[in-house]
């Protein structure tokens, strides 16, 4: 199992746009992508700080998913939303899942 933690900062006042982004990302997902779970979370002390945790079967499946042409059109729309609401580029942290319960 493999995961990626994505951390971003929202532009001021853009918290209400997160459900729109989540819906767009959910819409582009393919049933055979290897995705096990996605979570979108806001920092309780700093709601402008957002974390997305994506858990996949393996890093190999994650890299295949990144290149899947079936997702491209929908991802363009998601990237447009991100450009509107994020203050800068996301920070990516790749994680090996040691235990899951």
Predicted regions and their residues:
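Glycine-rich beta-strand-turn "strand-cap" elements at beta-sheet edges
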Residues: 2, 36-48, 76-101
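An amphipathic, aromatic/His-enriched active-site/gating alpha helix that lines ligand/cofactor pockets
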Residues: 24-36, 55-91
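Short, well-ordered beta-strand segments in beta-rich or mixed alpha/beta enzyme
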Residues: 3-8, 38-68
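Intrinsically disordered, low-complexity segments enriched in polar/charged residues with Gly/Pro
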Residues: 14-15, 25-28, 40-42
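Short, surface-exposed ligand-recognition loops at beta-strand->loop->(often short) alpha-helix junctions
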Residues: 9-20
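Short, flexible segments with low predicted structural confidence
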Residues: 1-2, 17, 33-34
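Residue-level signal for secondary-structure boundary sites
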Residues: 14-16, 60-62, 100
């Amino acid at each position: 199992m493999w995961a990626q933690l994505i951390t971003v900062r929202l532009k001021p006042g853009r918290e209400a746009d997160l459900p729109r982004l989540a819906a767009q990302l959910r819409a582009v997902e393919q049933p055979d992508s290897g995705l096990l779970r996605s979570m979108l979370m806001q920092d309780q002390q700093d709601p402008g700080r957002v974390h997305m945790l994506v858990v996949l079967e393996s890093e190999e499946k994650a890299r295949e998913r990144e290149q899947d042409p079936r997702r491209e059109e929908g991802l363009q729309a998601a990237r447009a939303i991100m450009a509107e609401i994020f203050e800068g580029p996301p920070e990516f942290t790749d994680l090996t899942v040691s235990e899951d319960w």
